[in-house]
Design a protein with these regions (language model features):
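Hydrophobic alpha-helical transmembrane segments
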Residues: 143-167, 233-236
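Transmembrane alpha-helix/helix-exit interface in multi-pass inner-membrane proteins
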Residues: 114-134
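N-terminal membrane topogenic signal
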Residues: 27-44, 192-196
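Interfacial segments of alpha-helical transmembrane regions
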Residues: 95-114, 183-201
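Juxtamembrane "helix-exit" motif on the non-cytosolic side of transmembrane helices
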Residues: 53-63, 178-179, 210-223
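Short, intrinsically disordered terminal tails adjacent to the first/last structured region
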Residues: 1-30, 253-260
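Alpha-helical transmembrane segments
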Residues: 35-52, 200-206
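Alpha-helical transmembrane segments of multi-pass integral membrane proteins
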Residues: 38, 195-260
């Protein structure tokens, strides 16, 4: 009996993988994203892990990618601004549909993205060259004009990123396959669908959760792990920007949510 059960479970794995792949492709199609591009985005976080990891063999390449004021940090800043822009544009369309709660949540999300963008570049301190007030410098790990490097704030934000990444990864599964969600009022289903990222963006958020978990509980002081963190943050902000853009675009097209 046990052997038969094990064999059945083994046979069910390829079937589950196949079903998941089909669902990712189908889900991407609802956002007018081709299967090819959906799978490119799906694998980019993993490919980036390999690229950033390999860059450690070259000090120049590593610095170019992960040092302050270099490629990944400025790319993060740009993605955060894009996320804020499309979140606000999407909220305007949501208000036009009288989806007030979803619109307000997108406005809050957009404001949050602007605040994070400012924090990422220390509100322009290294661009304009102003000094850090002594009171802030004394409690800031990098002696910069930002709050996210203040020890207590930093720990809180790291936990928020970890659980936020996990929630963003799980929410699409919950909204698509939970019987409780399917039985909920249409307004609730619509709201959760609005807030749910595309399935192919899942690895962007899962990488963030995995990295933050390792940093918080395993590699607490590793300099290599700290520098590597620029890539999971890039993936997270890319996921946010893509989510906001796809929602904005979907709201401007024939809406599958309101058709169902």
């Amino acid at each position: 009996m046990t052997q038969q059960t094990t064999e059945s479970e083994v046979r069910s794995v390829p079937s589950a993988v196949s079903s998941y792949r089909e669902e990712v492709t189908r889900d991407a199609a609802t956002d007018s994203v081709s299967s090819r591009w959906a799978w490119v985005v799906f694998w980019v976080p993993a490919i980036g892990v390999l690229v950033v990891g390999a860059s450690r063999v070259s000090r120049t390449a590593c610095r170019f990618l992960v040092a302050e004021d270099h490629l990944l940090e400025w790319a993060q800043f740009g993605l955060l601004l894009l996320a804020a822009l499309f979140a606000v544009l999407a909220s305007i369309r949501l208000f036009g549909r009288r989806e007030t709660l979803a619109g307000l949540l997108l406005v809050i999300f957009g404001i949050g993205m602007i605040l994070v963008a400012g924090e990422e570049i220390s509100w322009g301190q290294r661009i304009f060259g102003w000094g850090t007030p002594e009171s802030l410098s004394a409690i800031n790990n990098q002696r910069e004009s930002n709050l996210h490097n203040v020890l207590g704030v930093q720990n809180t934000l790291n936990y928020l990123k970890m659980f936020g990444g996990l929630l963003a990864f799980l929410l699409p599964f919950w909204t698509r396959w939970s019987t409780r969600i399917q039985a909920a009022p249409s307004s609730t289903r619509t709201l959760l669908t609005r807030l749910s990222p595309a399935l192919f963006l899942g690895p962007c958020f899962l990488l963030t959760f995995g990295y933050r978990f390792i940093r918080l509980f395993v590699l607490k002081t590793s300099e290599t792990a700290i520098k590597f963190g620029e890539w999971p943050e890039f993936a997270l902000y890319f996921g946010f920007a893509a989510f906001a853009f796809l929602l904005w675009r979907r709201l401007g097209q024939t809406d599958p949510v309101n058709q169902s």
